[in-house]
Every structure is written in structure tokens, then in C-alpha cells.
A protein has these predicted regions:
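Chalcogenol-based redox active-site neighborhoods
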Residues: 1-157
Length: 157
């Protein structure tokens, strides 16, 4: 799929939460949404990133953080419980062709092929993409500060 673009409407998607119910982006209409996308919770950088992000994002008003990976909902649920992550919503893309197609974040080759690349996307209250950072190197953290800053200012636009 093609990568989403800033200034455009974020495509709706269906992702699966830990109770196996589907969640749509449109369910969060009127809120700012930060998509924290990563290959798997079982890679060390991802665990760190989710933890750090959880802490910071919880301070933002009217903002939801969706942590999206190909991990099964059961694993995500277990991870969040173990880590005490209460303020992020873990969502699985394991059966979400629309997310994979419309966001263009699936890794195309190499050992991580088929998993989602590491990226942070900020969507404003009107559903417009305001910030995208695709991290080329799997072991690197995204620039969370930039994303949080963008999310914080997204209301004024």
C-alpha cells in the first residue's frame, strides 16, 4: 500500500482490541489520535517506546494513543497488564487488510517481512493527518517529543 500523507484525511481502519472486538478510527472522532505503530511488543525497543509514550501522552488533553502491531490481541493484552499500561489502547492489525493497505507501513522484505514498520502518526480532531514519522532503522526510537508537540498543537489549527 501507499504511505498516508500529512494534510490528508486519515483513512478509516478496523483493528482488533484485546476482547477481539473491532475498533475503527472513526470511533475516536472528536479526539486527537496518536498511532504508535511498531513490529512487535516482543522487540526491546518497542516495549520501551510504548512505556515512554504511555507516560507522556497521558498528559495530553482529549488525546487517544493507539499502539498498533501485528501481535495477537492476547499477547498485547498480557503485555499491557504486565507493564501496567492503562492509558494506551493496544490494537492488533493481524486481520486488518484495510490498515495494511491504506497506511503503507508493512515491511516488504528482510527478516521482519510482513510485520509493521515503526512509525508515529498524529491525527487531529477532524481526522486529518498532521504528523508522520517513519523510522527506517528498526532498533531506533521514533522522535516522540515531535509527535507529542504536534499533537498538542493540533487543536489550534
Amino acid at each position: 500500500g501507499k504511505m498516508v500523507k500529512t494534510g490528508r484525511k486519515a483513512p478509516d481502519f478496523h483493528l482488533t482490541q484485546s476482547d477481539l472486538q473491532d475498533v475503527k478510527l472513526s470511533d475516536f472522532k472528536g479526539k486527537k489520535v496518536i498511532l504508535n505503530v511498531f513490529p512487535s511488543l516482543d522487540t526491546p525497543t518497542c516495549a520501551v517506546s510504548v512505556r515512554e509514550f504511555n507516560e507522556k501522552a497521558s498528559g495530553l488533553e482529549n488525546t487517544v494513543v493507539l499502539c498498533i502491531s501485528m501481535d495477537l490481541p492476547f499477547a498485547q493484552s498480557r503485555f499491557c497488564t504486565t507493564e501496567g499500561l492503562t492509558r494506551v489502547i493496544p490494537l492488533s492489525a493481524f486481520r486488518s487488510q484495510d490498515f495494511i493497505q491504506n497506511y503503507g507501513l508493512q515491511i516488504a522484505d528482510g527478516p521482519m517481512k510482513g510485520l509493521l514498520a515503526r512509525a508515529v502518526i498524529v491525527v487531529d480532531k477532524k481526522g486529518i493527518v498532521r504528523h508522520i514519522q517513519l523510522v527506517k532503522e528498526i532498533s531506533q526510537e521514533p522522535d516522540y517529543e515531535a509527535a507529542l508537540e504536534r499533537a498538542a498543537t493540533a487543536t489550534t489549527e
